[in-house]
Structures are given as structure tokens and as C-alpha cells.
Design a protein with these regions (language model features):
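Transmembrane and membrane-interface helices of multi-pass
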Residues: 2-196
Length: 201
């Protein structure tokens, strides 16, 4: 059965739109609020950083979709990657007044116990994010329902291209201070919370 043009267009736009929504949800979770001032003071002046974050989420979705060929799982996986670090950062700031740092991953079990003892609760932003992520996941099922199965060669090529683009973004941009500074992202090791406010988690 031939796929209609509107549906093909929707399938092309869905990953980009879902990644954008998850990016906004992550910022809402990390900051606790997402106001006009947030956009004016932090997001718009550092647009390049948020464009890179969106591109990262988009490429993660594409890679998961090429590997799994199950769009709801690709959507859910991308959303977890986009929102979970933001939630951890929010609670870390609440508990100790310091932002989440990569080496904090080594203390996950300890942090979970402390968070439980401190009586931390789900924030409105987190509840709304869970609902919207579930809605996106369900929507992806209906948008891609009936999609033709890919043969192994195009699937392998798509997986390789997505993985290569993701590696290029991580190792060629994110981990290259000279490149990030050209994009207006300046390292701020002494004030990681300020870095997150400017450029996102």
C-alpha cells in the first residue's frame, strides 16, 4: 500500500519535533521553571548550545530507530537520555546546592538513598514531562504504523551513518573546546551550575 504524502511528511518531521519537545522538557525539569525570562536571558543568547543539544537528541533517535526499527522505543530512549540527567541535576541541586557532575554516576545508589531519606517529591515539570513523553511514544506508534520493513543493507547503512554523525558530534564538537568556543560555549569549571544555566544540562 502506498503511503500518503502527508504521512510521509509527518514521519520525516516527527524525530525533529520530538527531540525539540524533549529538549524543552529537559530544560524545564533542570531549572524548575521555564519562563519568558529563561528564554531571553539564557536560551536565545546561547542558541548554538541548545541547537547542538537538539542535534544530539535527534541523532540518538535516528540511531535507535535504525538499530531497533521500533519508533516508540527510539522515542522513549531519546526522551530518557534527554530528561533523566536533568532530573538528577535538579535533585542534586536541591540536596547539596551543587550541580550534577559526570563522576556523580559512581554514587548513584548512595544518592538514591539520600534522596529517599530527604523526602524529595516529583515536581510538576516532571509529571508533565512523563505524560508528554508517553504521549509522544504512543504517537510514534501510530505515525510509523505500517512502515515497510527495511532490507539489511539500507538498515546497516542508516545505522552506520547515524552512529558516525553521533560520534562526530560528540568527539568532534562536544569534546573539542576550540570548536565549542567558536559556537559561543565557554568552559566554566569553577561554576558548573552557571554553565548549566547558560548552556543546558
Amino acid at each position: 500500500m502506498k503511503t500518503s504524502k502527508p504521512l510521509l511528511t509527518l514521519r520525516m518531521l516527527f524525530p525533529a519535533a520530538a527531540s525539540f519537545i524533549v529538549l524543552l522538557l529537559g530544560e524545564w525539569i533542570a531549572r524548575g521553571s521555564l519562563t519568558a525570562d529563561t528564554f531571553i536571558s539564557f536560551i536565545f543568547p546561547h542558541f548554538g548550545a541548545y541547537l547542538l543539544a537538539w542535534l544530539l537528541l535527534f541523532l540518538v533517535w535516528e540511531l535507535l530507530d535504525w538499530v531497533l526499527r521500533i519508533p516508540p522505543l527510539a522515542t522513549l530512549g531519546m526522551a530518557v537520555l534527554g530528561c533523566a540527567p536533568c532530573a538528577v541535576n535538579f535533585y542534586t541541586m536541591q540536596l547539596r546546592g551543587e550541580p550534577f557532575l559526570p563522576w556523580d554516576l559512581m554514587q548513584v545508589s548512595e544518592a538514591a538513598g539520600v534522596a529517599s531519606a530527604a523526602g524529595l517529591k516529583l515536581q510538576t515539570s516532571m509529571v508533565v514531562s512523563i505524560v508528554l513523553v508517553l504521549a509522544l511514544t504512543v504517537a510514534s506508534f501510530f505515525v510509523y504504523r505500517g512502515r515497510l520493513r527495511q532490507r539489511w543493507l539500507p538498515r546497516l547503512a542508516g545505522t552506520g551513518a547515524s552512529a558516525a554523525a553521533l560520534c562526530l558530534l560528540i568527539f568532534g564538537v562536544y569534546l573539542q573546546p576550540a570548536v565549542t568556543q567558536v559556537l559561543g560555549i565557554t568552559p566554566d569549571a569553577w561554576m558548573q551550575d552557571r554553565y548549566y544555566r547558560y548552556y543546558g544540562v
